[in-house]
Amino acid sequence: EVLAALSYYPELKDTPIEFKFKDNIRKSTMQAQPTFGSIFRAKEKRQYIILMSRKIQIEDEHFTMKDIPSEVLIGWLGHELGHVMDYRDRTGVGMIIFGIKYLFSGAHIKEVERAADTYAINHGMGEYILKTKNFILDNASFSDRYKAKLRKLYMSPEEVMHLIEEKQ
C-alpha cells in the first residue's frame, strides 16, 4: 500500500520518508511530520516520518491495519503524503508555527486536513480518498457525533467528487 500511494507522488521520490508502525497514536490513525532533527535543515534536506497506528480505535470499534481494506489504506497514506507535500515549502520556523496552530486552532486543522486531501486528489488519488471517507462515514458502528466531527474537519465525499470532476 505504501508503494502504491507513493507512486502518485513522483516528486517525493528523493525525499526521505520513513513509514513506521506505532502501538498507539493519540487521536489519530496516521500522522505525518518532519523528523525532529530535520525541522531546521534546508527544506530540500528535511526528512519525514509517517507514523501508522498498529491498533486503531474509533469509539468502541477496534481495528488493526489488516482489517482495513487495501484501497482505504492507500487513501489514508495518500492523505498523509499530502501533508508531506504541504510541509515541503515551509521553513523550520514556519513548521513550528504550523504545529502550534494545529494544536490550538480548529480552523487551522480544517484548513490543513482539506489541503492534504486536495494534494492527494490533485495527484490522482481521488477515488482512494473517496473510499477512505466512505469507509468511515458508512460504518454503522460509529456515532453520528463522531461522523459530524469528521465532516466538520475533512472534505465530504461530495466535495471530493466535485474536485475529481473538476480535475477531469
Specify the residue positions occupied by each region the protein language model found:
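A metal-dependent hydrolase signature that marks the N-terminal structural subdomain at the beginning
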Residues: 1-45
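Active-site scaffold of zinc-dependent metalloenzymes
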Residues: 31-70, 87
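Short, contiguous hydrophobic alpha-helices characteristic of membrane insertion segments
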Residues: 48, 72, 144-147
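Short alpha-helix carrying the canonical HExxH Zn2+-binding catalytic motif
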Residues: 68-85
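Post-HEXXH active-site segment of zinc metalloproteases
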Residues: 71, 86-114
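An active-site-proximal "capping" alpha-helix that borders the catalytic cofactor pocket
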Residues: 109-126
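Long, well-structured alpha-helical subdomains associated
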Residues: 125-168
